[in-house]
Every structure is written in C-alpha cells, then in structure tokens.
Amino acid sequence: ADELDVPTIMRIGAARMTAGLDRMGRIDLAAHQEIFGPLPRVSAQQLIDMAEQVDLRGQGGAGFPFARKLQAVVDAVKRTDQPPIVVVNATEGEPGSFKDKMLMIRSPYLILSGAALVAEALEAEEIFVGVTGNELANRSIEAAIAAEPGLRALVRVFQQPDRFISGESGALVRGINGKKPIPPGRKTLAAEKGVGDLPTLLSNASTFAQGAVLAVLGPERFASVGVPEEPGTGLLSVSGSAKRPAVVECPTGVPLGAVLDICQAPAGDGVLIGGYHGMWLDAETAYQVPIGREGLASAGGTFGSGIVLPLGDGTCPLGEVSRIASYLAGESSGQCGPCKLGLPSIARAMASIVDGSGGIEALDVARRAAAAVNGRGACSHPDGTTRFVLSALEVFTEDLAAHVFHSTCGRPVRGMLPLPEGPEVAEAKQIMVDWARC
C-alpha cells in the first residue's frame, strides 16, 4: 500500500482533531465517546454564535465563514418552510490532500458527530456524505454509520467520480441529485436550493470535525491555542519533498518552517501552499510565514485546504508546474469556453517554455491566456489554475530566465508534485518522462 493510504499523523502542540490517534489505529464508537465525551445539544442560533465567536471557517479551500453558511440555511428554511439537508463534502479530489481521508479512516465519528450536531441544530432529517474512490476511507465511514443506530437512520453515503472538480460544491449537489457531477453552468447557492432543491448546508469533512471539537470544548477553550483573530488548530497535508509525509495538526501562528522540519521536507526552490489552486512561496518566505489564512495572505500565499507541497532540491520548478497545468487543463468540465480553450493554451505555452522551444513568445502567450481566462468561468477551476501558474512565474524567476533565454535549466523533472493514477493524467505524466532533462 502507498504510505499515504493510511496517512501518518504528526502534531505540534495539543491534539484536538487528532486526539487519541497516538494510541489507536482507528477510533471506534466507544473510544470516541471516551475521548471526546458527549456532544452538547445546541440550537441553530447557539451553533451560529459559537462559530462566529471563534471565526470558524470552511476547511475545504475557500475558507468561507461557517456561521454565515448556517445563517443562510436558517433564513432559507424560514422563507421556504422546507426542511434542510446537510452534506459532508469528503470527496477530497485534489492530489496532495489527505487530511479528510485520515479522519475518515482513523476518526470517522469526529466527522459524523459534527454533522449530526449540525443536523440536529438545523432540524435536518438527512445527511449525505459525499466520497470518492478511496476504499479504505469509504469502508471506515460506512462501518461507523452501521455501528450507530442513530446514524443509520440519518446518513447516506454518495460516491462521486474521482476527479479534481468532483468536490466543487455545485458538482457534488448535482451528483447527489442524479445529474452529471460537474459544476453547474450558472452559479447557485446550495443554502438556497441544493439537494432535492431544498436548503442545504454543505461543508468540508474537516469543518464538521472542527465543529465537533468546538462544541465539546466551548469557544473559550477552543480559542486557548492559536492566534487570537484565528484561534484553534488546523490540519495540513504535507508531502512533496517530505521524507516523512504526514497530516500535521498544529495551532495557527506556528511558522511553516516548523512543519517542514518535522516532516523532513526541504523547501528547495519553493513551497506550494493551498494545493493546485494555491500559490507558491519562495523558500525564505515559506520558512518564516505563520500558519493561518491571514499570515499566509500577508506573505502572498493562500491557506486553501491546507496542502503543503515543498519542491525540494534537484527538480525543475517550471517543469513541475507544467505537468500540473496539463493535468488541470484535462480536468476541466468543458462547459465554459475560457476554461475549455484557455487552460489547454496555458498548458501548451508552459510546456514550450520548459522544453526550450517557446522562448519569450510562449511566456507572453501564457500570460495573455491567463488574463483572458481569469474571472470568466462558472466555477473556481480556471481562476485557481491561472493563480497557480502566474504565481510560479513570479516566484521561479531564475528558472524562467534559464528556460526562456538558454532553453534549459539543466535539471530533471522528478515529479515532486503528486498526480492521481489513471488514464486522464497520462499526458501530464508523459511530460515528466519526455523531459528527462529539461
């Protein structure tokens, strides 16, 4: 099995979402109740107040305030007099992210109890858990549901295809509704009209786990670690150059360098933060920047879903970026022209920069195509992809100059940025083979 099939866990500071996992492989129902105790019963307003007090944010990438999601569903229920639905987004379709899989495999009741807490507060009668094809994670979640009668009556597991865009909220809602599981052509709010056209509270699996921790600890204890404006701990998925890839739980405010050090992960030319819709930081900045949304934003980064991918030494940075640009172009749902046409144009331009055939003209094409795509898609995929590529062009200036003016940087493309298995990434993987020495 791959070492990330059952992710290793590391901690800096107190264990919260990873509590008990230092002594148990998987936390069953009895152990979960022993470690976390009973969840308090809370009203929707109490839950909103707690989430607001600690500024609880979504853990899936966008970082949307959880209290605002809750309030939007409460308002929609009052307006329509329809019962709400709760959806746990555990698809985790992005390569490099495995924090949700870790919780599903090893602490499934933390996710499920958080979802049940929200469902009770909202008076929802049904919870959907959206998953993809990780059999170990799916078996663990299904076994956890089967072992608890209250969950058996409440929770249904729904499997999405293994694609990058499967976790987009609109794509997940469409999938559950029996439609093609791609982002809708027109942006819609799940809180207004989601599963079965009912008001739907949809959030990431780790967000529900955080909600359970918040309910157990209460806002004051929850906020006793981390920075005051963004308290608590977060889960980071660290791989790339890491000799010890792991899910790391740490308080906000901890320097990213401390996380890289415990994972034995040299930064090399740079570190990608926030996954393939994230941004690059140079090594010096990466080691000093504090973990958290505000700290990373102040340094030009983005927290996203907590993915940390250091490049390490000895690989071609732009070659790595080009592989991923090709993969992301192939993951488009193909329904928006800027995405369907623009992302392949960016990928081709990046490939010709790296192989030395494109020069300054290819660089101009990449930048123009990115500008043409940005802000024009129905979902976040084109914007995220252009952000990833343009950030690389800003951070890897020395490598860019070597390729544009001298055709090569002389380093191989080692494949430090992960790609999923399967035919849809064959072209991107072939690039790595073709550029044995770029």
PLM regions: where:
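Ferredoxin-type iron-sulfur electron-transfer modules in oxidoreductases and energy-metabolism complexes
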Residues: 1, 35-50, 77, 82-84, ...
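Hydrophobic alpha-helical positions that pack around
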Residues: 1, 82, 133-252, 263-266
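Iron-sulfur-cluster electron-transfer modules
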Residues: 1-180, 434-436
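Short acidic, glycine/serine/threonine-rich loops at helix termini
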Residues: 62, 67-70, 97-100, 139-144, ...
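Short loop-to-beta-strand transition segments
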Residues: 69, 125-127, 264-276
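Short amphipathic, charge-patterned alpha-helical segments
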Residues: 112-118, 251-267
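Short, surface-exposed connector motifs at secondary-structure boundaries
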Residues: 121-128, 241-244, 331-332
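C-terminal accessory/binding modules appended to enzymatic or scaffolding proteins
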Residues: 231-244, 250, 256, 418-438
